[in-house]
From Swiss-Prot:
The keyword Repressor applies. Activates the small RNA gene sgrS under glucose-phosphate stress conditions as well as yfdZ. Represses its own transcription under both stress and non-stress conditions. Might act as a sensor of the intracellular accumulation of phosphoglucose by binding these molecules in its C-terminal solute-binding domain. GO terms for biological process: negative regulation of DNA-templated transcription; peptide transport; positive regulation of DNA-templated transcription. Residues 1-116 form the HTH marR-type domain. It comes from Shigella dysenteriae serotype 1 (strain Sd197). Pfam families: SBP_bac_5, SgrR_N. Disulfide bonds: none annotated. GO terms for molecular function: DNA binding; peptide transmembrane transporter activity. Residues 163-492 are annotated as: Solute-binding. Residues 26-49 bind DNA. The keyword DNA-binding applies. This is HTH-type transcriptional regulator SgrR. Keywords: Activator, DNA-binding, Repressor, Transcription, Transcription regulation. HAMAP family: HTH_type_SgrR (MF_01449).
């Protein structure tokens, strides 16, 4: 019998007998475990061989045998739990232990570095599952980072300095304002073993042609092997950077026929998905990666929803005891902000916008927040920390304003905290704030009626590219802000847009109201090298590594 099954049977027997040694019979024990008399004898003999109990059998009708427990079910349960932790079987661990506080304590104690059978394993604690990793769909901050570890694109952007680098394409050139040519590497393999072909690249780009930032791609052809020509309807100075974004990452052309592709995607990147459940995401270094192989062999993201209510503000890679911590932090390139929806009467009303912006000013929100949040929040006066576009101007409450509707996406505890503070402040002015929590997909599409939306944005390097690119690709913003997005996109592609002025106009009209910049934190380990926090609050897994302990 497998060890795990035998352990479960012993724990069940120990619980049924309340851990007490006793005189009993095979028939009575078999009834407790709902098995045959013969199987019960086999179980007892095997458990006795393991040293868990003693079974002193008595022969004869009416004779009772002696059962003596040498091991407690609790001790064996703990051992089983440790085994499940080492095997990263978090689903089974939760089922075995049951108590959430105990599970959390066990997970935290096993965070950080592990070295098993010659492999370096990194364990990370996170507050929610990462179930959708499909490029081109509505991805949140962390899903965007994970997708970059799984997929490759024609180009990539260096997370540390924002510079453009080669990826699947080793060189490229602009033949004319509307014609670009990319030269691709041969011998690139997908995680499921197949070699990448030009048809995969062409299909990946045609798949995203409906997205606003990629709608100007007129044609994609391969004139010669490993050469890709892209023809545009309008010039785009940003095209090489655009093709390094997550929506433009390369998928196998048969991706729609592959089971559960969104949660178990197949790419050509440095890591492949091994497991993705509600309790755990496990990715493993891809040995056939066309670039430098990752130095950390395996990354396990353990999901513990209970930590969502803690304002940790970042990733936890190390538990509270043991090796000394290394903490890295940065103020996010982005902010929480209010978005007024011009589709509703109150959202479009300038007096409402001015007054709400005044009473829900960044300083008011920080003032009414609990101390644990005040340490992580910094008042925002622009979409970026270096910008000071917003001006706090005293405004009178509009006559007849009695209620407002605020909407945000779920699984984000700070949204609830900020909304609660807003509700408290507005109530003091006799305004009722109705709060709606919706899915991220619903939020992204923006088809629900709401006066105001509570949003957050994290912009990646280079900022002069990603800021407009991020805002332009969210349908919600295009619904709420009635400007000529296509004309602005054309100006941006031509390099004719003053991005700071464009954002200042959005803030001045109160279409967007910056609220809070958040401190991003990684609690790491001193032995980890190459850990550089990116603007998404994560770090490039393939570049990190563990230094061996100092020789004695």
């Amino acid at each position: 019998m497998p060890s795990a099954r035998l352990q479960q049977q012993f724990i069940r027997l120990w619980q049924c007998c309340e851990g007490k040694s006793q005189d009993t019979t095979l028939n009575e024990l078999a009834a407790l475990l709902s098995c045959s008399r013969r199987h019960m004898r086999t179980l007892l003999n095997t458990m006795q061989d393991r040293g868990w109990l003693t079974w002193e059998a008595e022969v004869g009708r009416g004779k009772r045998s002696r059962l003596i427990f040498l091991y407690t079910g609790l001790a064996l349960q703990q051992q089983r739990a440790e085994d499940l932790l080492e095997q990263d079987r978090i689903d089974q661990l939760v089922q075995l232990v049951g108590d959430k506080a105990t599970v959390r304590q066990m997970l935290v104690s096993h965070l950080g570095r592990s070295f098993r059978q010659g492999r370096h394993i990194l364990r990370v604690l996170y507050y929610r599952p990462l179930r959708n990793l499909l490029p081109g769909s509505a991805l949140r901050r962390s899903e965007t980072h994970i997708a970059r570890q799984i997929f490759s694109s024609l180009t990539r952007i260096n997370e540390a300095n924002g510079e453009l680098e080669a990826d699947i394409a080793h060189h490229w050139q602009q033949i004319s304002p509307l014609h670009w040519r990319f030269f691709l590497r041969p011998g690139v393999h997908f995680h499921h073993g197949r070699e990448l072909e030009m048809d995969d690249v062409i299909a990946s780009f045609k798949r995203i042609n409906t997205l606003p930032l990629y709608s100007h791609i007129a044609d994609i052809v391969s004139p010669t092997p490993w050469t890709l020509d892209i023809h545009l309807t309008q010039p785009d100075r940003w095209l090489p950077l655009l093709l390094g974004q997550v929506p433009a990452m390369i998928l196998p052309r048969e991706w729609e026929t592959l089971s559960n592709f969104a949660s178990h995607p197949i790419g050509t990147g440095p890591y492949a998905v091994i497991r993705n459940s509600t309790n755990q995401l496990k990715i493993q270094a891809f040995d056939d990666f066309f670039g430098y192989r990752a130095l950390i062999d395996e990354v396990n993201v353990w999901v513990l929803p209970e930590i969502a209510d803690e304002p940790a503000g970042g990733l936890m890679l190390k538990g509270p005891q043991g090796e000394e911590k290394e903490i890295e932090s940065r103020l996010e390139e982005g902010c929480y902000y209010l978005l007024f929806d011009s589709r509703t009467h109150r959202g479009a009303n300038q007096q409402v916008r001015d007054w709400v912006s005044y009473v829900l000013s960044p300083t008011n929100l920080v003032y009414f927040a609990e101390e644990q949040y005040q340490q992580l929040w910094f008042p925002a006066y622009g979409l970026l920390p270096r910008w000071h576009h917003a001006r706090t101007i005293k405004s009178e409450k509009p006559a007849g304003l009695e209620s407002l509707t605020l909407t945000f996406y779920q699984d984000h505890s700070e949204h609830r905290v900020i909304a609660g503070i807003m509700q408290q402040i507005l109530a003091s002015h006799q305004v009722t704030l109705e709060i709606k929590e919706i899915s991220y997909d619903q939020w992204h599409e923006g088809e629900i009626e709401s006066d105001i939306w509570l949003n957050s944005a994290n912009f990646t390097l280079p900022l002069d590219f990603s800021l407009f690119a991020h805002l332009c690709e969210v349908p919600l913003l295009q619904h709420c802000i009635p400007i000529d997005w296509q004309a602005d996109a054309a100006r941006w592609r031509n390099g004719e847009m003053n991005l700071a002025n464009w954002c200042q106009q959005l803030v001045a009209s109160k279409a967007m109201v910056p609220l809070i910049h958040h401190w991003l934190i990684i609690q790491g380990q001193r032995s980890m090298r190459g850990l550089r926090m990116n603007t998404l609050g994560w770090f490039d897994f393939k570049s990190a590594w563990f230094a061996p302990p100092d020789p004695e």
